[in-house]
Curated annotation (Swiss-Prot):
Compositionally biased intervals (Basic and acidic residues): 426-445
Name of the featured protein: Putative uncharacterized protein UM10309
Region (Disordered): 328-365, 379-459, 525-555, 569-589
Biased amino acid composition, Polar residues: 398-425
Biased composition, class Acidic residues, residue ranges: 536-545
GO biological-process terms attached to the record: CENP-A containing chromatin assembly; chromosome segregation
Length: 589
């Protein structure tokens, strides 16, 4: 929220799209980011769309030679490329368009020649602010994942706007005009609103762009060339929603960035901006958390109670935000989100167990649900686990006398050759492996939906999420294989509510697709291995009926599959910690 606007009656300049930006090293660097084919395509667009925001190219004032009219040969056009001076400027727009679409697009012509042609011949005085902004956005259009976007939310006053839908009253053009008036109190700037393709023109696939799903605002400081041609602040407003995707900055520090977002909130009729709640870790985050009041507002009046949602794919973030029941807050009830929310199918429909025998969050896709309990053995997959090599003590036993070997019989290795199984056993294991694979595929389809066509991955119904973070408050399992009881009293540790609990984070380019593959591959199962001797303690008294079976040999120990040691705490009723009293962060989204 803007607290202290400029007291000056005369506002600072808000540059228009047609204002001139002289050539500079920064502008040359911005031009050099594009490939030569992209430069040719962009210049062709400038020549075809002669709008008021574009500066027209400089043409030659020489009259065409007798009998030549406006058409020229390719040889003459090549001379125009190699001889960069006024004498070689084109006489008409058609001639210039022919130059850029013909010889200039030849791969033998270097990109440096095209850059020199723009800066010295066709646009020697400079480009407009709109043309500079298109240079930046043309680069981002072809590289959709080149920026990292974070989510903020516009907060509206319920007393003024009871419906909380003030963002629907203003169009993107009105917001741009009001935003320019607000920013004029603080610094000289330029705001570029990227035009979206009209719905009736979207039939042609060539004109579609991922930016058409947003109202794209690019804000830069002016008039210094390094600021005009710099990164700037990019704001993607989801139309008819209070959500913004933000990337970039204005100058050094975060003051100008927060000031511009507060001005955007005022332009959209909102009272303040809601940022992601800072995670305690750094000294700056701890200081900011200490400054927040009971309502979660900082000294500037900005709220910081929103759950963190960021990523490189703006369309994936948009898909999450557009769902009316989506939740970004870490304290929100994830079970309230329907099947369409990021999480995919039934994997998002987990209900928290309130006691009893009902399924809870511990039965989700990351932990094998109760319905998927099966024999924990690799033989279901048609694989017989090999016997580990003999330890040093076992090798010594072989070389000792017969009296010593009788006290501890040597373990016999199991042969892995095909002749080690009868045909009936081989056939049975093959049938069991096939049944298991079909069951795993069925469960993956139930949890995450059907697998997409590998030749058309765009039809995948799973939303692309780059990070899923869980904060679970549950006791640590008593894993005797790690000798935890010899290090710390786990009972006392788990009974202390102040002790840190378990946090789980999954990251990747497509987390849900990865989980679907793991479930389909049967990696949520477990196998067994031979005990290396670390299992000591209370577990030694269990399963007395099997003690004689493994007497004289090494007792097998269960190995957990995906997600590993969390399988051991399934009986502890894993639950997510409920929201503290008075916490309204679950309503932020």
């Amino acid at each position: 929220m803007i607290l202290q606007p400029s007291s000056s009656k005369s506002k600072l300049t808000s540059h228009q799209d047609h204002h001139l930006v002289p050539h500079s090293i920064s502008l040359r660097r911005l031009l050099s980011r594009l490939d030569k084919s992209e430069l040719v395509s962009l210049v062709t667009r400038w020549l075809d769309n002669a709008g008021p925001s574009y500066i027209p190219p400089m043409l030659s004032r020489r009259q065409p030679k007798a009998g030549q009219e406006d058409s020229v040969t390719n040889l003459t056009l090549y001379h125009a490329i190699l001889d960069l001076n006024e004498e070689r400027r084109c006489r008409s727009m058609d001639e210039l368009r022919l130059l850029w679409t013909g010889p200039m697009s030849d791969p033998r012509v270097p990109k440096a020649r095209a850059l020199d042609r723009i800066s010295d011949v066709d646009w020697p005085e400079g480009l407009s602010y709109a043309m500079v902004a298109e240079l930046d956005l043309f680069y981002a259009h072809a590289r959709q994942l080149s920026k990292t976007w974070s989510t903020v939310k516009l907060e509206y006053d319920d007393d003024v706007d009871a419906a909380g839908r003030g963002w629907e009253r203003l169009s993107e053009t009105q917001i741009r005009l009001r935003l320019g008036n607000e920013l004029g109190h603080y610094f000289e700037h330029h705001i570029y609103l990227h035009p979206r393709v009209k719905p009736e023109d979207r039939n042609a696939a060539a004109v579609r762009s991922w930016t058409d799903s947003f109202s794209y605002f690019r804000i830069v400081l002016a008039p210094i060339p390094s600021d005009v041609c710099g990164t700037g602040l990019h704001i993607l407003h989801l139309p008819r929603t209070p959500f913004l995707l933000v990337s970039g900055s204005l100058g050094r520090g975060s003051e100008n960035r927060e000031m511009a977002l507060s001005a955007f909130a005022a332009a959209a009729g909102a009272t303040t901006v809601n940022y992601a709640k800072p995670a305690a870790g750094s000294a700056a985050a701890k200081k900011l958390l200490a400054e927040l009041n009971d309502a979660g507002e900082d000294a500037a009046g900005n709220r910081r109670t929103l759950g963190e949602l960021r990523g490189k794919d703006p369309l994936a973030l948009r898909e999450i935000l557009l769902h009316e029941s989506g939740r970004l807050s870490s304290t929100s009830d994830a079970s309230a989100a329907p099947a369409g929310v990021a999480g995919g199918g039934k994997a998002r429909q987990m209900q928290f167990s309130q006691g009893g025998s009902g399924q809870g969050a511990e039965d989700g896709p990351l932990i094998a649900p109760l319905k998927r309990r099966r024999e924990e053995d690799l033989s279901l997959l048609g694989i017989r686990p090999p016997t580990p090599p003999a330890s040093g003590s076992e090798r010594d036993t072989v070389s000792l006398s017969s009296a010593s070997t009788s006290a501890r019989p040597t373990q016999r290795r199991s042969s892995l050759t095909p002749c080690s199984q009868t045909p009936q056993e081989t056939h049975q294991h093959a049938r069991e492996a096939l049944t298991t694979r079909m069951e795993s595929q069925r469960e993956a389809n139930e949890l995450f939906g059907p697998k997409p066509n590998p030749y058309d991955p765009s039809n995948d119904a799973l939303p692309r999420v780059e990070r899923i973070e869980y904060e679970l408050h549950l006791p640590f399992p008593a894993m005797q294989r790690y000798n935890t009881r010899s290090l710390i009293d786990m009972d006392a540790y788990n009974s202390d509510p102040e002790k840190p609990k378990i946090k789980l984070r999954l990251e990747g380019t497509h987390v849900l697709a990865g989980l679907r593959k793991l479930v389909a591959a049967g990696m949520d199962r477990s196998t067994s291995r031979l005990d290396a001797g670390e299992g000591q303690g209370d577990d030694d008294d269990e399963e007395d009926g099997q003690a004689e079976k493994y007497e004289g040999a090494v007792k097998p120990v269960k190995l957990d599959g995906l997600p590993g040691w969390l399988t051991e705490v399934r009986g502890t009723k894993v639950v997510v910690q409920p929201s503290p009293p008075g916490d309204d962060s679950s309503r932020d989204m």
